Structures are given as structure tokens and as C-alpha cells.
Amino acid sequence: MTRFVLFISCFFLIGMIVECKDGYLMEYGGCKMSCLMKKGTFCAEECTRMKGKDGYCYAWLACYCYNMPDWVKIWNRATNKCGKRK
């Protein structure tokens, strides 16, 4: 029983340490990656190409990805630069 509790504790600890992020992929210029006129699997393929687990086209407008590595830039409302001049 003690080993089982130890195993579960380690499992949750690893889950907290290896935390990935979810969010919208960004295009050049800081805008969300559009999927309006793309094929149905476009977002899943793009997310996988960026080493994410999966993705989908949110409301047929932008690619949303799950479990993205920390090095991938994702769109953030607070730092949004889409359509703004430098």
C-alpha cells in the first residue's frame, strides 16, 4: 500500500513539473494563425509540426493547440501586437 501511495505521489509530481501550454498558434506579425479557408486537418497538422499534442480550428477562425512546448510562441491577449504598428 505504501508503494502505491508513493507511485501516485510521484505521478502527480511529474505531472505538475512537465506542464505544457495550450493556446492559439501565431503567424508572422503576432496574429493568430487563421484556418478560415483551410482543410479540416490543417490545425492538427500545424500543431503537431510544432511538437504539440493536437489542435483544432476554433470556430473556423484560428488554430488552437494543446500541450505545446514552452519554446513555441502562442498568442496572448495581454501582449497582442496583431495589426499594430511598431
UniProtKB/Swiss-Prot annotation:
Cysteine amide PTM sites in chain numbering: C82
GO CC field: extracellular region
Localization per Swiss-Prot or TrEMBL: Secreted
Signal peptide: 1-20
Tissue-specificity statement: Expressed by the venom gland.
Family: Belongs to the long (4 C-C) scorpion toxin superfamily. Sodium channel inhibitor family. Beta subfamily.
Protein's recorded name: Beta-toxin To4
Originating organism: Tityus obscurus
